Amino acid sequence: MLAIISPAKTLDFESAVKNFPVSQPHFTDYSEQLIEVCRKLSPQDLSSLMSISDKLAGLNAARFAEWTKIHNENNSRPALFAFKGDVYTGLDADSLSEDDVIFAQSHLRMLSGLYGLLKPLDLMQPYRLEMGTKLANPKGKDLYAFWGNVITQAVQQAIDEQGDNVLVNLASDEYYKSVKESQINAKIIKPVFLDNKNGKYKVISFYAKKARGLMCRYIIQHHLTEIEQLKEFDLGGYWFDSASSTETEFVFKRDINE
């Protein structure tokens, strides 16, 4: 079983990280090409392209300038502990055991606009480059054109290494679009998280993001290997609703206590 999630805009390169055997990101040749494109953009260009403040644009221009293909523990940190934000709040990597993190290294991948696909312990440097960014590059008009089949093939390879042909899609639509589903040889399960608010069950973005992280945590902590085991997910007060689910879309519901 392989789970995929989105990265996060919020990063943490300050707090202490447990000592794990780190790995190298696989697609730094590609990352370097994107960095070269981004370095040609002024902070004003970045502000417009990414719809961010002048302050954030300046920060990210500096990050692009400082980025280097060489990743070590002085300039980088493992992706699992670098990303913060709603999904990663639910995942809560800092509280995972060593065995859990080792399991995650084989069973979890993070999609990335700059790095393509990251294993949890792959080193990464601070950056902001969302997959949906319309960054013109030598391969096309956006990052989907840039990455082409590269991410899809890497995801398939990771699935093949599991041996059970199961992909759990916990990524946002923006990031999952970088995976060409028609080319994936696996049973793809998409968990959907609905919260009851004012008498109706619906997707509430903040809660859904955190729930995707909770599901990752559940898979990792319980070392899941079977599709049916996903239905037992109960973190955060969610429960599996078989009546609303299909063979490939697993619906989990929760009643919010106001």
Curated annotation (Swiss-Prot):
<dbReference type="GO" id="GO:0033194">
    <property type="term" value="P:response to hydroperoxide"/>
</dbReference>
<dbReference type="InterPro" id="IPR005583">
    <property type="entry name" value="YaaA"/>
</dbReference>
<protein>
    <recommendedName>
        <fullName>UPF0246 protein HI_0984</fullName>
    </recommendedName>
</protein>
<dbReference type="Pfam" id="PF03883">
    <property type="entry name" value="H2O2_YaaD"/>
</dbReference>
<dbReference type="GO" id="GO:0005829">
    <property type="term" value="C:cytosol"/>
</dbReference>
<comment type="similarity">
    <text>Belongs to the UPF0246 family.</text>
</comment>
